[in-house]
UniProtKB/Swiss-Prot annotation:
Keywords: Nucleus, Stress response, Transcription, Transcription regulation. GO terms for cellular component: nucleus. The keyword Mitochondrion does not apply. It is found in: Nucleus. This is Protein OXIDATIVE STRESS 3 LIKE 5. It comes from the Eukaryota. Probable transcription factor. Promotes slightly the tolerance to cadmium (Cd) and zinc (Zn) and to oxidizing chemicals (e.g. diamide and tert-butyl hydroperoxide (t-BOOH)). The keyword Nucleus applies. A motif (Nuclear localization signal) lies at residues 117-125. InterPro entries: OxStress_Response_Reg.
Amino acid sequence: MEVLVGSTFRDRSSVTTHDQAVPASLSSRIGLRRCGRSPPPESSSSVGETSENEEDEDDAVSSSQGRWLNSFSSSLEDSLPIKRGLSNHYIGKSKSFGNLMEASNTNDLVKVESPLNKRRRLLIANKLRRRSSLSSFSIYTKINPNSMPLLALQESDNEDHKLNDDDDDDDSSSDDETSKLKEKRMKMTNHRDFMVPQTKSCFSLTSFQDDDDR
């Protein structure tokens, strides 16, 4: 196996002048090419000009669209029959206050009421009156579940009156009959107290009297 051994260092003194002149010529050529390839100064300004032109075009388009929309909305409002009818109806009626300089008499200051508003006000008043009358009548017609009908009390009161009349007519009756009547009255009062419902919030005075007697 053969091994070739040589010097690893190069003698720079052996470089000829021709070799030194080559890099100079190459560098000069590269510099010319760089100068030839450099963009002109006008190309940078052309970008700004195109953007300004685009902005001007956008402004013109938006202004034309806004004018078209305004003209369309105005024509649409004029063509609507509702607005025309309302404007014709409220001509001269939108003043809520009268002018004192134009008024010659006190009668001119009075606001003229239209018959439609007057009729509407009367109808509303009649409806409210009917509702109030119906509500007041319903108070008496409604049945309170906590209250007991007064039929039993009325019957007992009538019987008491009858017994009193009999006592007036029979002044000459004996003491036995009066005792019997008293017993009947006691039974009726006890029966009446039994019929009337006694709740926690309401008590009858007769029940307390009976308790005291007992």
